[in-house]
């Protein structure tokens, strides 16, 4: 894994993005923003799921005028998503923590300057949200919907904002496929110092989005690219946050939560491993300590994996071993193994939290 690229640090509300700040997770509500009750309920769900920043669509004046009250109620920093109607950004900038503009449809230089001035007055950032499906006509005609076209759009709009004296910027270059997304971010990275918002747009339902996002976002994170991210899923809000956190964890960019290892099963297994793994997965969701937990169906790989695990199960015939920090802790009947594993994992979390508090 490459060292993370150092970028300029900005703030969306109280959440730092870039520099040495942790990589934050974002999501977006799907209710009509003007329906304050429904939108607040979705924001609360995202906050409970572990989201750091939430974006809301601003499609009309009714949405824009709801932002002041939403900002007052929201437990998370609020980003206004603006397309086409720049005047909505001017209203939104009075309340929210960040404005996202799509350079492909926001309009003329004068309109972008008006948005920049409104954001500068309040000290909030602008995300230049380039989308491969809606490039400005001049870049679409010259480059097509290619990574180069996306990069040129980003550079052009960054230069515009800088010429207006505005440098409180973050950038995204999203396409609906893995290759264009990765190539665009990779090409732009050495050319600018601004933080990157990672994402694959229109990524599809849970299964398809997990594959696309893991490949694109996980690959970029391993290259050291990325400061904040959203996993786009046609599905439940919480899924976006859960998948994003998993990508951060398994790419090594987030040292929090359980890293679960389990074998794929084979003819040697004499226990209901699939059921056991599902029960373990569900019961350790709440653990925030960076623990490695291994659930293995037989002794072939169990002892080797357990050497690297904080706590492990090695199933046998009707019973199994609990292995803690590479040492056999006890042998128990099969039906008691999951309970004991969870109990020991929670002990390890308490020890981790106590040590963290002391330090």
Swiss-Prot record:
InterPro entries: Dihydropteroate_synth-like_sf, IspG_bac, IspG_bac-typ, NO2/SO3_Rdtase_4Fe4S_sf
EC number in record: 1.17.7.3
Pfam families the record matches: GcpE
Cofactor(s) demanded: [4Fe-4S] cluster
Keyword 4Fe-4S: yes
Catalyzed reaction equations: (2E)-4-hydroxy-3-methylbut-2-enyl diphosphate + oxidized [flavodoxin] + H2O + 2 H(+) = 2-C-methyl-D-erythritol 2,4-cyclic diphosphate + reduced [flavodoxin]
Superkingdom to which the source organism belongs: Bacteria
Pathway terms, separated by semicolons: Isoprenoid biosynthesis; isopentenyl diphosphate biosynthesis via DXP pathway; isopentenyl diphosphate from 1-deoxy-D-xylulose 5-phosphate: step 5/6
Binding-site residues for [4Fe-4S] cluster, renumbered to this chain: 263, 266, 298, 305
Enzyme superclass (EC): oxidoreductase
The keyword Metal-binding appears for this protein: yes
Similarity section: Belongs to the IspG family.
Protein name: 4-hydroxy-3-methylbut-2-en-1-yl diphosphate synthase (flavodoxin)
């Amino acid at each position: 894994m490459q060292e993370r690229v150092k970028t300029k640090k900005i703030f969306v509300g109280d959440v730092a993005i870039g520099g040495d700040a942790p990589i934050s997770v974002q999501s977006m509500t799907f209710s009509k923003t003007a329906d304050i009750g429904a939108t607040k309920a979705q924001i609360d769900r995202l906050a409970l799921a572990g989201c750091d920043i939430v974006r809301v669509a601003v499609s009309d004046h009714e949405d824009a005028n709801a932002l002041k009250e939403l900002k007052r109620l929201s437990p998370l920093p609020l980003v206004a998503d603006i397309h086409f109607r720049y005047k909505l950004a001017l209203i939104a900038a009075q309340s929210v923590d960040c404005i996202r503009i799509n350079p492909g449809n926001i309009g003329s230089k004068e309109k972008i300057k008006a948005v920049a001035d409104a954001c500068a007055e309040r000290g909030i950032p602008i995300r230049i949200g380039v989308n491969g499906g809606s490039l400005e006509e001049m870049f679409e005609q010259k480059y097509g919907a290619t990574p180069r076209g996306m990069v040129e759009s980003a550079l052009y709009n960054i230069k515009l904002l800088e010429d207006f004296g505005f440098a409180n910027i973050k950038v995204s270059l999203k396409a609906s496929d893995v290759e264009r997304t990765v190539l665009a971010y990779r090409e732009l990275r050495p050319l600018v110092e601004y933080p990157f918002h990672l994402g694959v747009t229109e990524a599809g339902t849970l299964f398809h989005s997990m594959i696309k996002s893991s490949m694109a976002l996980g690959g970029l994170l391993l290259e050291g690219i990325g400061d904040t991210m959203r996993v786009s899923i046609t599905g439940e809000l919480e899924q976006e946050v859960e998948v994003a956190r998993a990508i951060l964890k398994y790419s090594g960019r987030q040292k929090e939560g359980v890293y679960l290892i389990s074998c794929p099963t084979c003819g040697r297994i004499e226990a209901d491993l699939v059921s056991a793994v599902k029960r373990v997965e569900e019961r350790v969701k709440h653990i925030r300590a960076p623990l490695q937990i291994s659930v293995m169906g037989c002794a072939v790989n169990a002892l080797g994996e357990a050497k690297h695990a904080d706590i492990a199960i090695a199933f046998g015939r009707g019973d199994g071993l609990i292995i803690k920090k590479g040492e056999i802790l006890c042998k128990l009947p099969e039906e008691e193994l999951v309970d004991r594993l969870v109990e020991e994992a929670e002990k390890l979390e308490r020890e981790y939290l106590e040590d963290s508090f002391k330090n």
